[in-house]
Amino acid sequence: MAQPLFSKIEFIPKGHLYMNILKALFGNYSKKELKRIQPICDKVLALEDKYAAMSESELKNQTAVLKERLANGETTDDILPDAFAVCREGAWRVLGMKHYPVQIIGGIVLHQGRIAEMKTGEGKTLVATLPAYLNGLTGEGVHIVTVNDYLARRDSEWMGKLYRYLGLTTGLIVHSLDNEGRKKAYEADITYGTNNELGFDYLRDNMVVYKEQKVQRGHAYAIVDEVDSILIDEARTPLIISGKGDKSTDLYAKADKFARTLKVQRFEELDSKEDMEDYYAENDIDYVVDEKQKTATLTQNGVKKAEEFFGIENLTDPENLTIQHHVNQAIKAHGIMKLDVDYVVKDGEVIIVDEFTGRFMYGRRFNEGLHQAIEAKEGVKIQNESKTLATITFQNYFRLYKKLSGMTGTAQTEAEEFQEIYKLDVVEIPTNKPVQRIDLPDSVFKTEKGKFKNVIDQVVEAHEKGQPVLVGTISIEKSEELSKMLKKRGIKHNVLNAKQHEKEAEIVAQAGKLGAVTIATNMAGRGTDIILGGNAEFMAKASMRKQGFTDELIEESTGHAETDNEEILNARKTFDELNSKYKEEIKEEAEKVREAGGLYIIGTERHESRRIDNQLKGRAGRQGDPGVSKFFLSTEDDLMRLFGGDRMKMVMERLNVEDDMPIDAKLISNIIDSSQEKIELRNFGIRKDVLQYDDVLNKQREIIYGQRDQVLNGEDLHDTIYKMIEDTIDTSVKQYLPDGPREHWNLQSLKDYYKDWLIQDESRYDFDLEDLEDMEAEDIKNMLIEDAKAIYKENEELLPTETIREMERVYLLKNVDTHWMDHIDNMDQLKSGIRLRSYGQHDPVVEYRIEGFDMFDEMIESIREDTVKMMLVMPKKVYEVKKRQEAIEAAKRMALKQAQAAHQVVLNNGEDEEPKESPIEIALKREQVAQPTETSGDGTDTANKTIRKGKKVGRNDPCPCGSGKKYKKCCGKDE
């Protein structure tokens, strides 16, 4: 490899120097907090001998002792040392694991409602048991949140053994669970589940009709694993329960066709697009893409072309907003969204690729029509638009908890955001063993081709000496390109991206074997440790698969749930034997890997977020193991292009730097770090902006869900309905009979408004417009209110009280849900439109808040009005239906009575009588006469046909149906 240029250059920007001075003067926040926490940790450690000396029954009984202390007025902080010490001893007896001092510190931080930053391999799963056990003693419920079902199930079974041993119950929330199972799981002291499932359960709970259908029981305390992924990366992605919406229009295809005719200009520098309108016009530029801001905007030239293409005069007119929206989404689909980076096309569907993990996000869709625009771009079926039934962001869901905490290996870079949005401090927990990973400076190349050549050279060199290598890429496309290059060099390797994710855990687990080479996108195994020398657990499972064990049994072999199933017990025995065997075998290999330098992490591009880069680095140097990390960059990388890559490339060309000659300089790394900080600040600003808008809807959601709960919990609505009647009539009278001159009154419209609900029967209700003209508006209002209440009172007397109360409840909930769904859509449209307006000095968020609450008030009025209408009309209709049903039942009873009274059914004219039918059979036959005629598959009628037994009945004979009439006047009249 060529000698690096400027290799001795060291540069520290003023900002970095300033921060270092601040740290020197005031000390590091985490270090100060750790000093405060250490005495609590010491108390826990001091109790070790006390609880170790206890018998099984004595230790188990400590849960009851601690609960009693809480009942007597002590707080969880008071009992923390004892609770942690009990849990620690229990873990040793049940799991064979004892919390290290640093893990106790991590547990204390979590209990205090903070974020514990703990490096990879430091045992976060075990750490969570300490605060979970302590807070589980309160009986209010603890939620331990993971990013997927696999981790939730694994941790609940594994750590559940400890909780059950100590007398606490555990629950598990996974996608396949039914409502009854969910309710039981939430009733447990400690519940494991994914962020998606918990959020969706909350939304579904606020759509139920009966409180017994709710599954959650409150939000007391949550411990969020991989907290940065859930609260930062997914903060902008709302949880949405959707229903079938309108059919997608052909505008998506038309807008896509238009977008393909346009000429685009891409900007990579913020300062390079000033005063560019003349340039756009001269070069026929139709739309501009700002890759840094991720926006696509039509130029004046593009606007004119759109008006010509769609045959409209002014694209910005309000009546053309729909066309404008579709065009904007089409140019965004073509200009911003990239195939195999932002999304993939699989089996005729567009599937989102998570920007932070590289995983496919099945079931998720881009909102505001962007997904349909991409479908049009890729030529796949454009799916129907959906209607939002309920929605919430993770930001607002997790802020429901009285106490929130989290764990991650990378949180410091987002410490400000955690504090500002969630009021969560980040405390860095020291590792149990010193980190031995060496982080080498970045190498920057002139071209991507030169960079990849050096990456492959590094991989080959490391592979030949037995050092395992994990190569991180930021897209599927790049991972596959590197894979082709390695194949040409004859290097055996594994590729892990969203297209080949089925064996993710196994590939990641074996990435630490001697000479292993793994190429992975950002998804590379959070939740699965890379162990030097190989992972004995996965080797044991592979061996069991060869022996013929089913996948189900192999899964159960590492489970911790209690069972007496012989097959499962045998599988566990086999696994334990194989696991022990492979652990011994890999010891020698692990030592060789350590001698080779440990795991070598190669980053092929910097991510927008330093945190994602740190996660990749953190795969190496686990639990004091050696390791190396290095990033290989080029001036053509996306991040470099956006922040001066072109200028850097020009400098390198002037210096005649070859494509494969790297520049290793602290200056470059600092420039990149600074660029990442700028992007992080921008993304924080975007998330903050999203939250400001969502807070408006969230406040409205709290009001609606709170009042909904009052209805569910059995609040008597009689007085509420009376108040609704008064408010509804007051609003309508003010609308049609406004203050001021009477010529502005519209009595006819007022009468039309009340038609069919207040004025149900004009003969009964004397609504004489001439008489009303002489009355005051206030008197008219009072008269209408009095009459409405009279109708309501009459309705109450028609049906049982419990029926009326149930109708009030169900109709009110139905109207709340229907109007809330429409309101969510209206708020979305308001948000989209408000950003297009120019308010001068006005803040768009303030305008959104004002208009949003005006719309909310209108929604409340609509709920009130529809509920009043239903309660004045429906009880009478229900009563009439009930009366009709009673009349039908009475007729049936009469028919049965007549049949029973008949002393003779069939006369056989002296012949032997056939067996007589019972009176009930006869009555049923009579009832069948009234049944409708159906048509069979061949078009023939399948109506009931008279089947006679014995001799034909004469026309003047008594009718055999038992009516007492002659046959010709009864059943035989049509013959």
Where are these regions (language model features)?
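Conserved P-loop NTPase motor core
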Residues: 2, 6-13, 18-656, 705-706, ...
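Hydrophobic, well-ordered secondary-structure elements that form the walls
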Residues: 471, 519, 820, 856, ...
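Short Cys/His-rich zinc-binding micro-motifs
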Residues: 949-968, 972
